[in-house]
Amino acid sequence: MPLGLKPCCAVCKTQSSSMWKKGNQGEILCNGCTGKAVSSGGSGASASSTIQQNNGGGKQSKQEIHRRSARLRSTKYKAPASEKKVSTKGKGRRHIFKLKNPIKAPESVSTIITSESMFYKGIYYQIGDVIKVIDEDDGKPYYAQIRGFVQDQYCEKSAALTWLIPTQASPRDRFDPSTYIVGPEEDLPRKMEYLEFVCHAPSEYFKSRSCPFPTLPVRPEKGYVWTHIGPTPAVAIKETVG
């Protein structure tokens, strides 16, 4: 029974009963009238006809309205859901990178590689080579000797230098190794892009103040790695042979 409606027996019109049942034609019967309706089918049929007559005149009981409304089904045609279109294009970069969880890149560790030689801009440098550095302030050249090479993790090449100090005999327009003195060593390396190659390691060391023997050659020396650039005094063949 729907909520809020009190049942009423179709035969005896009572509204109190320990148990309610429905007859063969859907009428409501109390517990006392249930046995009578089963024994006398004719009486049940007449009772049901009287119910229909009493409820006639274009009005239906609330029970029957509720029972019919529960059986109503929508007859409106529903078109089947269209299939989802599958994109045939390639997947974008955002989809590719989101497939996996992002991983934090490891911190870069500074690694330094030292070597005794280095190839830079078509020139093969070695330890002991002489280079030239131009000062930005006065524009004068300063000479130094390479004592080591350094390369970092970004392939940036540098060189550790030992400065060469000129003397009064050092020419101003060219480099003469025999007239320079070995100076202080520089602590920090300099980039190779600021260095200009002069010559490879000379055949002899630079001029030494404490050397007991003269370092300046008495006569022209030939067949060495370096030699003077410029005119040399003419020497007789006999002197060179002797």
Curated annotation (Swiss-Prot):
Function: Component of some chromatin complex recruited to chromatin sites methylated 'Lys-4' of histone H3 (H3K4me), with a preference for trimethylated form (H3K4me3).
Disordered as annotated region, ranges: 44-85
GO cellular component: I band; nucleus
GO terms for MF: sequence-specific DNA binding; zinc ion binding
Domain of life: Eukaryota
Compartments (UniProt record): Nucleus
Assigned keywords, A-Z: Metal-binding, Nucleus, Zinc, Zinc-finger
Species this chain originates from: Danio rerio (Zebrafish)
GO biological process: chromatin organization; regulation of DNA-templated transcription
Zinc finger (GATA-type): 9-33
Protein name: GATA zinc finger domain-containing protein 1
Biased composition (Low complexity): 45-54
